[in-house]
Amino acid sequence: MPPEPDEAGDAAQPGVHRATPRLLIATSVPSTLTAFLLPYAEHYRQAGWRVEAISNGVSRVARCVAAFDAVHEIGWTRKPTDPGNLTSAPARLRQVVREGGYDIVHAHDPIAAFVTRYALRGLRAAGTVKVVYTAHGFHFYRGAPPVQATVFRALERVASDWTDRLIVINQEDLAAAQAFPLARRGGVVYMPGIGVDTAKYGRDALDPAGAARVRGELGLAADQPLLTMIAEFNPGKRHKDAVAALAASGLEDAVLALAGDGPLVGEVTALAADLGIGERVRALGYRNDIPDILAASTAVLLPSEREGLPRSLMEASSLEVPVITTRIRGVTELVTPETGILHDVGDVPALAAAMRRVVEDPEAAREMGRKGRLKMAEFDLRNVTALHDELYAGLLTDRP
């Protein structure tokens, strides 16, 4: 790793305590902020904190500019081999942290978290700042490619020495983190995800006109089935399984709506055309009306091979929409046979059968949705923000 040319200078400048706590949230890309973290910015700003964000491209996202007290650009990327992640990005981050005088820096994805902890290790050792990482799903999960798992496990073990608190959001990751020395120092904390706002994602909170608008936009008849998947178009989400399952399901009038962006949009829509269902597979792009899309849906799909604790399933269940998903880490903590339908990764026939089941037995589907809503109480955003309050308070008390 390249040296930190100004680390000695950083370490010589302890943090200055202020009456107003200062929090910097670090992510590789702004979509992580908009998808998961804006409620935290609102919560802590209302509590009297100064909350800022650093991400690549964040100043061009109006929702982020409005949500935070300030936003900062940084040139890191989500590509692990990008040399800038360990050359220019650390110096930029140290500059922002020195100027901002933050009490806590909280990172939220693997690359940003590794670079953050590497860059701030001198400041942290000097007691200038506390560093927190929420792992939204380790890359060394059960069933991961062996080389990938070995590399990411080793990197996380190293970086955990530069971490004050590591938050994990599922039981498999909690077990894995117990092997790190950080766990023996009490630095590993379990939280049930990043929370779902069950008040916002509740049938009573939504105007039915929103769901009607979505169905009208898609040209659906009143009783026409709508199967929805909300996920970035990347290989691990396995959109092609959803398309292939729809083609095999025999549900000739069902529509599959795919909300999200990503590099595989063209491949997925081409597959739909090749299978003769191109007109029934709709790539919706990035959307700001996810609650209405979910409320308009017959069921929500997520055939992923890797997840942490998927927000889309939490939101769907909170809205009493049945879910069809894979039997993998994190997901099985959210979904049981009573609240949804689970299948093995890559099992397209099972996914097709699940589609038929929710369409052909609507009462059973509604009962899954009702039970899913009850299950989400333990993942409510208010519970998770209270856990963050407790964690942050402990870190502030522990400041020199």
PLM regions and their residue ranges:
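Aromatic "clamp/platform" in nucleotide-sugar-dependent glycosyltransferases that forms part
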Residues: 286, 305
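A conserved mid-protein helix/loop that constitutes part of the nucleotide-sugar donor-binding site
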Residues: 34-39, 225-248, 263-269, 314, ...
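Short His-centered aromatic/hydrophobic patch
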Residues: 107-113
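Conserved acidic donor-binding segment of nucleotide-sugar-dependent glycosyltransferases
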Residues: 337-348, 357-363, 377
